Amino acid sequence: MRPNHPVAALSPFAIDEAVRRALAEDLGRAGDITSTATIPAATRAHARFVARQPGILAGLGCARSAFALLDDTVTFTTPLEDGAEIAAGQTVAEVAGAARTILAAERTALNFLGHLSGIATRTRRFGDAIAHTRARLTCTRKTTPGLRGLEKYAVRCGGGSNHRFGLDDAVLIKDNHIAVAGGVSAALSRARAGVGHMVRIEIEVDTLEQLAEVLAVGGAEVVLLDNMDAPTLTRAVDMVAGRLVTEASGGVSLDTIAALAESGVDYISVGALTHSVTTLDIGLDIVVAPPKAERA
């Protein structure tokens, strides 16, 4: 099942912060010395962002910011919005202004646009594979350091939903917590006593025996069914019988996700949405350049 809510907006402050870091990394101490050396300062250019392959678009705000942060007179225009389906050969945006600025910001803009569109595209593929079921697709915290907010936004652009943004969003008792705490019962009872009533508690289990203990002890609202095959997952969902929200996770691929979703599980979390993404191929093509270089 695909969520039908609109894509939640991404803060422009979050966009600018990430793009500033990327520009600083790329421009270094002296800026784009190649463009400065070869292109007169007064030269203007017009370029198009063109998709080289089909996919789902994400990251327009980052691409726009890459130019605006260097020169607010550069214009960035697009008829599209993040989440749009794009075809190979389609123009997704255009930029016009100082040629030096366009070339200096080009790679930063393309890096964000390609990376985030790659996440959105992969998310859509996983979502399409389970669209015939009630299961909802969600991401994980397996994100690129410093880019979590952007990457989780791209997941939403692709039709997925977000799991925890950080460790302070909810309690998620994993296998290592259980091992250190002394077992499922001890971990659950301490968690329930240690957080307020408004905090949701999820616990990870990897066997049906652990699941039975969770159901007997109580205290959790969500159970994460880790690395279970489809038949075992179906038995687990039957055991829960609607008493807890169920989430399947662990080694989920495009080849396996449909069978897992058909078990009746509520959510399927997929780390591969963000941790091993292939960039969507988008290029920037200069379409208008002066026939003769102007003097600075």
UniProtKB/Swiss-Prot annotation:
Identification of the protein by name: Probable nicotinate-nucleotide pyrophosphorylase [carboxylating]
Species annotation: Rhodospirillum rubrum
PANTHER family: NICOTINATE-NUCLEOTIDE PYROPHOSPHORYLASE [CARBOXYLATING]
One of the GO biological process terms: quinolinate catabolic process
Molecular-function GO terms, alphabetical: nicotinate-nucleotide diphosphorylase (carboxylating) activity
GO cellular component terms, semicolon-separated: cytoplasm
Gene: nadC
Subunit structure: Hexamer formed by 3 homodimers.
Catalytic activities: nicotinate beta-D-ribonucleotide + CO2 + diphosphate = quinolinate + 5-phospho-alpha-D-ribose 1-diphosphate + 2 H(+)
Residue positions binding substrate: 107, 140-142, 164, 174, 204, 226, 249-251, 270-272
EC class name: transferase
Entry's family note: Belongs to the NadC/ModD family.
